[in-house]
Amino acid sequence: MRFIHTSDLHIGKLLEGWDLSEDTDYVLDQLVDIAVKEKADCVVIAGDVFDRSVASEDCLVKYDLLLKRLCIDHGIKVLAIAGNHDSGERLAANNLLLELSGLYYVVGRPTETIKKVTLKDEYGPVNFYLLPFFTPNDIKKFFNPEVSKYTDDSAFRDLMAHQEIDTSQRNVLVAHLFAAGFTPSGSEFGLSDVAGVGNIAIDRFKDFDYVALGHIHNAQHIGR
């Protein structure tokens, strides 16, 4: 299966007051062109679709046009999750209706069971697990509400312990988080993450054949 892994589009971002609308249009055009040229089966957007939780009308139109070009014009599926800059509720509005099309899948808020979307190619099923941005408290309330000290790694460990993943199949995790061993880039890390508190241990991803992450603003390869 061929898919394009991207993230952190940050549609609507201003750079020191400078409007990046034209730059955004150029990048989104490139995304569509590459997906079409490479004959991608789907495009994975691993969080931070928008730069602000309340996106402007212009930003919403840009994203709608991107989906229209990929899904409707070219039949390329899109799988998306919310990042920390997105409003999960807004991003996933009408998601049940959109899923009926079989072309667009989006998850806005973390739940006890990670959303699984299964696509098929000539070799069989590929399972995409869509995990939007979460804080330790988001997961703590599901499994360990009484625990006082709870990190991102603890939260991810407990979340994975409650998933049923068939490791004999091909599995892809889509998430918006920091993995241990990343190189800090841009503004998407704080002091806690520098100290390693916000990092997920690499061995937590052992059930997945590929992990499509967002949150870091340059391309990196971590793990096997």
Question: Which residues fall in each region the model found?
Answer:
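Extended recognition/assembly regions associated with phosphoester-bond processing machinery
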Residues: 1-45, 49-224
